[in-house]
A protein has these predicted regions:
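Intrinsically disordered, low-complexity proline/glycine-rich segments
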Residues: 1-100
């Protein structure tokens, strides 16, 4: 069984501030929204840096993606995939489209 496929506007696990998937493949959609794949970034948000208050603004890409399901040569993003470096993970995706 696979994990829910993520898409533009879906949430990532928050740290200093919330963020969502910002980039997707415009001509490949899940639930009528562009899918987000390996290498696609989230919205600008705050990231904690030890010893440097306050949090800094950054974006981060999906580092991992499906090894089996590819979109334009990139692994499709799924809930639980790592976003980084040193960032978070994909938190939300399609309720009815899964990828292994």
């Amino acid at each position: 069984m696979g994990s829910p496929v993520t898409f533009v506007g879906a949430a990532d696990v928050p740290h200093c501030s919330p963020m969502t998937r910002a980039v997707g493949v415009p001509n490949v959609r899940v639930n009528s929204v562009a899918v987000s794949c390996q290498g696609h970034v989230n919205t600008p948000h705050l990231r904690p840096v030890p010893g440097i208050p306050p949090c800094i603004i950054h974006t981060a890409a999906i580092l991992t993606g499906s090894l089996r399901v590819r979109v334009t040569g990139l692994g499709i993003g799924r809930v639980g995939d790592i976003v980084g470096p040193l960032c978070t993970a994909v938190a939300a995706g399609s309720p009815n489209v899964l990828a292994g």
